[in-house]
Amino acid sequence: DNPLVRARAQESVEGMVQVYALCSTSIRKQTPLLCDEMDKFREKGLLGAPELQWGNKRKGALWMNEHKQEHFDGMKKIIRSKKKEDELNMILHWLQVPGLGLPKAGFMTQLVMGKGGCMDVHNIRKYLPEVDSSKGTPNRWQTSGQSEETKKRKAVDYLSFCKLAGGAKGLWDQWCDFIAEQYPDAFESGDHVSKLHPIWVS
């Protein structure tokens, strides 16, 4: 299912924006609510969707609306480069968007090119139990207000951690299975959760 999302993100500016909208909408939002929220996005767009009108989500939506073409072009350039550091370049590319820290920039890297991964609150509880997940992104991956050099160093550490936790595919499968267990009334299986991702961005 990830390749379908990837294709959507890479086919057009509109496709990339919709994948970004899914990523931003998913921040601190229960997964079963994403179907309704993405319907609202399709109806009202980036600057009208209710879930994207507050705090950092609003800042990100405004930025993306203004810079979407150049951001899409930059994303495609990284993908076409096929360099060994393309994963790092991509997560740093998405880290430019206001409101996206390393976990969600990693999620966008996962969605648009099948690399990276998302260390969301569920994965932080699982892989870093000593960290207080209620406080959001752990200090080791905080990038707000930090130098480009520090962001790059933290991104390298983040991507290494994702690989140890199973890589983009492993994290995707584990997360989908976990969400299905958490919300059995909403999802039949992890495969069901996975198959919804292309629908959310269609």
Please report, for each region that a protein language model flagged, where it lies by residue.
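C-terminal accessory module of base-excision DNA glycosylases/AP lyases that mediates lesion recognition
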Residues: D1-A7, R58, N65, Q69-S202
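Structure-specific DNA junction-binding interface
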Residues: D1-G55
